[in-house]
Amino acid sequence: MEVSGIDVSSHQGIIDWSKVQTDFVILRAGWSWYQGGMNIDKCFLENAQGVQKAGIPWGVYLYAYDKSPAAARIAAARLSDLLADYELAYPVYYDIEDTKYTKMSREDNTAIALAFLEAMQDHGHYAGLYTYTSFANSFLTMEKLAAYDLWIADYRSKMGYTGPGDVWMWQHTGTGGRTQGINGDVDQNLCYKDYPAIMRAAVPPVEQNPPTGIPDGWVPQAVVDKLQADYDALEAKHSDTLNRIMNIIQEA
């Protein structure tokens, strides 16, 4: 099977989900902290309500900044709390790609990712790993992560990752992808596994009652806004760098 979907964050701004035509959506739930915990994407609650109202199957991803396995486990617990009132049809992905990890060892990066994935699984969620091909090849020990479903970004004409593990979702472009109801570019993905059927078989139905506010104990809005601005700048820089690398590879 093959279905087409998108992934979005606050970078896309306000989305008119009634106009979006897609098979699935992966929402950014937020990003983790160096020492543990997480910040919620400022558009997550609205996006979650929007996709549910539109009847679009969805999952989430958490952008990683954790600097230790202990921090990753705390982030997983916070994310599990956030998702308690939702019924997901796609996995919870750990997005490990930030440049800070290129300065850390492969062993440390792998231990951090594994800690998050194991913790999410212990919390009862279907956990998966998101990264891009060269990061997986250079900064992770993929043999230790092969038990988890992979979502790989590779903007070449075909999936280039051939390492350990199964790639069930391919992010094949980050620019030029347009979807009605969303302003600007949006990441485009292909999925090769029937996650909704798996989720229906594994999880009893729960009443959908999205929370109306942010849980107590989260970071002040001013700090959230500053971190959001920093993240958006990093995301733009990463996308530009990745596109230039892919262009060089294609021209070689």
Residue ranges and their predicted role:
Residues 219-223, 227:
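Flexible coil/loop interruptions and hinge/linker segments embedded within long fibrous stalks
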Residues 241-252:
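Short, compositionally biased P/S/T/A/G/V-rich stretches that sit at domain boundaries
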Residues 131-145:
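Beta-rich nucleic-acid/ligand-interaction surfaces
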Residues 1-117, 121-126:
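Substrate-binding cleft of extracellular glycoside hydrolase catalytic domains
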Residues 220, 238-242:
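Short amphipathic alpha-helical segments that mediate assembly, nucleic-acid/protein binding
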Residues 1-19, 23, 141-216:
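Functionally critical loop-and-helix segments that line ligand-binding/catalytic clefts
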Residues 62, 131, 154:
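Short beta-strand/turn micro-motifs composed of small residues
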